[in-house]
Swiss-Prot record:
Keyword Disulfide bond attributed: no
Protein name as catalogued: RNA polymerase sigma factor SigA
Protein family according to the UniProt entry: Belongs to the sigma-70 factor family. RpoD/SigA subfamily.
Note: A conformational change of sigma-A occurs during its association with the core enzyme.
Localization per record: Cytoplasm
Region (Sigma-70 factor domain-3): 217-293
Amino acid sequence: MADKQTHETELTFDQVKEQLTESGKKRGVLTYEEIAERMSSFEIESDQMDEYYEFLGEQGVELISENEETEDPNIQQLAKAEEEFDLNDLSVPPGVKINDPVRMYLKEIGRVNLLSAKEEIAYAQKIEEGDEESKRRLAEANLRLVVSIAKRYVGRGMLFLDLIQEGNMGLMKAVEKFDYRKGYKFSTYATWWIRQAITRAIADQARTIRIPVHMVETINKLIRVQRQLLQDLGREPTPEEIAEDMDLTPEKVREILKIAQEPVSLETPIGEEDDSHLGDFIEDQEATSPSDHAAYELLKEQLEDVLDTLTDREENVLRLRFGLDDGRTRTLEEVGKVFGVTRERIRQIEAKALRKLRHPSRSKRLKDFLE
């Protein structure tokens, strides 16, 4: 053991990453716990770990918690998964818009008869013998279960149909791994796999900014605690109250809440007919308001009229000195070069032009814009 620890400390961070990556590629999976154990001797920023998790995902390595690593869920997990679902209810969740193909799919699976416990065992026995038809029949009879579970995850950032598709993949894994000898119902066993497939898909695909799976699990736990406290207290719980329930610091809870925030697209449809977008209703803080723009145009017109009362040279000197045409002011010397005179001469012309503009006959036309 001591030799192993000594050897571990001799490895660099990159070498440990390489070893973990190779192990993950061979097995197809790594646990967060084994990564943490191998990395414990290094000082690593959370950003570095997130980058490494993302790299592993790109390499096809699945990241899971240790309690998820077993090939099959344990008894406690199955007990937790065992819930009563209304498999005859194939209605669409409120707020979900579906098209004809989805409606046809729901109608189709509603025609498939549910299986009794004896039939499930009979099909499972045939599946062990390699009967593909039994595998298909067992899966089809439980497609309603997938829909029932998928309904509970609507509003998490994925389309209802996508949730169903991910759940169906979990169902197929359950069909492959179901062992009827252990005594539990297939629906109980399949529920665990369906949920796992859906929650992982949400973690990987639902968010614009991807969050590591372990953080998604923490966010989901926080949301559950938040809802429970809302019911108990009759108001939104404070970060301190959530922290106490989750055994975390209030600062950590605030950090998780910040991470959990979803970016909202400016193209989000608004209105019953989706004929407007969210961006249409958000003020551009840098844009000039219509009233200011109108006032500016009127001032510009009045200024042009007033400047027309000066001589051409006086008007052009003021335009250059104050940048009235292009927004760039010039020095006396720069303007002098344009007219081929000294800077002192330009100063005199400017002073004379400004005196003329201050005369009540001209200035009263501009004073209203100063109020």
